[in-house]
From Swiss-Prot:
Summary of the function given for this chain in its UniProt record: Negatively regulates transcription of bacterial ribonucleotide reductase nrd genes and operons by binding to NrdR-boxes.
PROSITE patterns named in the record: ATP_CONE
Family from the record: Belongs to the NrdR family.
Presence of the UniProt keyword DNA repair in the record: no
Cofactor: Zn(2+)
BP GO terms, sorted: negative regulation of DNA-templated transcription
Biased composition (Basic and acidic residues): 7-20
Domain ATP-cone: residue ranges: 49-139
PANTHER family linked to this entry: TRANSCRIPTIONAL REPRESSOR NRDR
UniProt KW DNA-binding keyword: yes
NCBIfam families to which the protein is assigned, alphabetical: transcriptional regulator NrdR
Protein name: Transcriptional repressor NrdR
Note accompanying the cofactor annotation: Binds 1 zinc ion.
């Protein structure tokens, strides 16, 4: 690892620890030439995922785009930034474990709906309204009615109720 101060390539590791939920390793290093201490991060390099949009166009999977959509849906719901990050981590991890590098945008949308419903019913409705392209009040009412009926049937077990809604 090259020293940022003197560009010497030999350094020793002083300390290593896992960070970002185990997705990277943080290393504290010391240059053997000038003694400068610096921090490096090691991350697994993921194979790129190609998202196939509704219109057939392809684009690279963009973690920040997914997070923006989730943040928008979770606005003022009490869902923490950490919970949203973990949700994106889980979805990205699931996509990376697939044998296929191509994924339909609709698959990602369904994954988000299943997970976001566990965090907030309001966030679920907001995300569903954009993802499923609600055209009017009737679409909202139908989804809310199913959500309410299933919530009563499950005696308040919203995650199960919301999960079963994703197949509707």
């Amino acid at each position: 690892m090259q020293c940022p101060a003197c560009r010497h390539t030999d350094s020793r590791v002083l300390e290593s620890r896992s960070s970002e939920s185990g997705r990277s390793v943080r290393r504290r290093r010391e240059c053997l030439s000038c003694g400068h201490r610096f921090t490096t991060y090691e991350r697994v390099e993921f194979v790129p995922i190609s998202v196939i949009k509704r219109n057939g166009d392809r684009e690279s999977f963009d973690r920040s785009k997914l997070l923006r959509g989730i943040v928008r849906a979770c606005e003022k719901t009490g869902v923490s930034a950490q919970q949203m990050d973990l949700l994106v981590d889980e979805i990205e991890g699931t996509l990376q474990q697939r044998s296929s590098r191509d994924v339909q945008s609709s698959e990602i949308g369904e994954m988000v709906l299943q997970q976001i419903g566990r965090l907030s019913e309001v966030a679920y409705i907001r995300f569903a309204s954009v993802y499923r392209q609600f055209r009017g009040v009737r679409d909202f009412v139908e989804t809310l009615d199913r959500l309410q009926d299933l919530s009563r049937d499950e005696v308040g077990d919203v995650p199960a109720a919301v999960t079963s809604l994703t197949s509707a």
